[in-house]
Amino acid sequence: IPVCPRGSVRCQVSLPDLFDRAVMLSHYIHSLSSDMFHEFNKQYALGRGFIPRAINSCHTSSISTPEDKDQAQQTHHEVLMDLILGLLRSWNDPLDHLASEVHSLPKAPSALLTKATEVKEENQRLLEGIEKIVDQVHPGAKENKAYSVWSGLPSLQTTDEDARLFAFYNLFRCLRRDSHKIDSYLKLLKCRIVYNNNC
């Protein structure tokens, strides 16, 4: 995804190709998200007791998702599509701010800055790709535009250093968690829709 040459009007990419691109992109986003979490953890979070404070504190916790792979297998593909779209949209705003605020970290590693910007851009590309998939799988379907609103910007900008580092830690942790869910659901959908569960 970018799916079509710029300016092309009647460009139609096949569903298997759209899924291939989306799965590659979601896998890459999850890989970048994991890298960022580990880099942040190593440099800023060790010994600060963030783990017990972070339980159930993602802004997307209100989006009810399957508990495990078995539950995901039992979930209708339209529901999984809506979950993916909801999660991706829920990250647009926080990723924007993460990319612009991460430079304020003391001695922010350049790799962290680069990856934060890249994840922001790739998340938007993936969202556009999933919207194209939905158009092909359910043409004319009324799309669910629901997503979770993030209100964590003041925490990323607070002068309380411990609270600020925890806000970054939690955002990286939740991003890693949600990018893994998106990647898993997409792979499951690709298997189900493109290969008729023969994979």
Swiss-Prot record:
Listed GO MF terms: hormone activity; prolactin receptor binding
InterPro entries: 4_helix_cytokine-like_core (IPR009079), Somatotropin/Prolactin (IPR001400), Somatotropin_CS (IPR018116)
Pfam families: Hormone_1
Keywords assigned: Disulfide bond, Hormone, Lactation, Phosphoprotein, Secreted
GO biological process: female pregnancy; lactation; positive regulation of cell population proliferation; positive regulation of lactation; positive regulation of receptor signaling pathway via JAK-STAT; response to nutrient levels
Intrachain S-S bonds: 4-11, 58-174, 191-199
Family under the similarity heading: Belongs to the somatotropin/prolactin family.
Protein name listed in UniProt: Prolactin
Organism: Loxodonta africana (African elephant)
Gene: PRL
